Amino acid sequence: MENKALNSPNRQYALERTRNIGIAAHIDAGKTTTTERILFYTGLIHKIGDVDDGNTVTDWMEQERERGITITSAAVTCFWTQKQEEGLYKSFEALSNRINIIDTPGHVDFTAEVERSMRVLDGAVAVFCGVAGVQPQSETVWRQATKYKVPRIAFVNKMDRTGANFENALNDMRKKLGAYAFPIFLPIGAEEAFEGVVDVVNQKAIVWGAGDLSTEGLKYEIRDIPAALQDKAKDALQELIEAVSNKDDVIAEMVLEEKPISAQQLKAAIRRLTCLIELVPVLCGSAFKKKGVQVLIDAVVDYLPSPVDIPCAVGLVPGTTDTVQVEADDRAKFCSLAFKLWRDAYAGKLVFFRDRRASCRERVSLVV
């Protein structure tokens, strides 16, 4: 339910329906490609750009387009309504959501750019290469997210590549990052045979057309889980329930009383733990082959926090050393965090800031 006390009547998307997220990864894990696909499936763009062609939305600098890497963080906003689909329970079905995305650099030379972005995120999608698993910069951005207490979900990308191994990438997260990570989706096939994912919570298979890129990944089928994967899917569900019950009192009590746990109850518990940074849900797919991106967007809405789900920010009272708790509230005085300065050849000096409380209008002077 929306908390109307916190939301201005002029706000088109309630704070509860807003997600402020970042996409972070080691270089070449497919971070910008994933972002581009998200923008396409949410309808912000109508033609998918390519990093190698230098025409993606978030790589806008000339140097980025020439080199095919992200140098500076780029912010973009898109909108997503969870579809009602038979066999799949979703936490916020038929509700429209605003997703503000910051696409961060993956190269080690631009680590500071990631650091300043982490300070203003409510949640993050950590992208991992399905072949290489956890790489050096993966560890760096993970530490930065931990430092700023950013809840995150993980997306194992490039499952279509030769040598892709979902289990190895998952074990990497657990061993190298110390993540309490558990899959909520499993791959169907791997390398050239990768065709879709198993939804562990709903116990359904989601399959995209094999090798058919003409539909741009817009069409997929929801099926029963293939016989060869049914035992694995059941085991993954049981492992997920046990992992959640170790951290969540509601599910723990249901397990002890041997009560059946619905997809709705399990998803609610996963969301609670993700927002508390006590669990990392893990998904998989191939952004380049346009498989698994829609379920990733659903997961952003289902599991990552809104501005009202995170602890209050702590700010300084201007002209003093006193601190103040800043909660998301449209009724209160405007308060924001300036996190980046940029000098533009035409506009001059620009200040990027994150609204922490209330909102501002055009042509209003702010004290920085």
What are these regions (language model features)?
Residues 1-361, 366-368:
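Structural and coupling elements of P-loop NTPases
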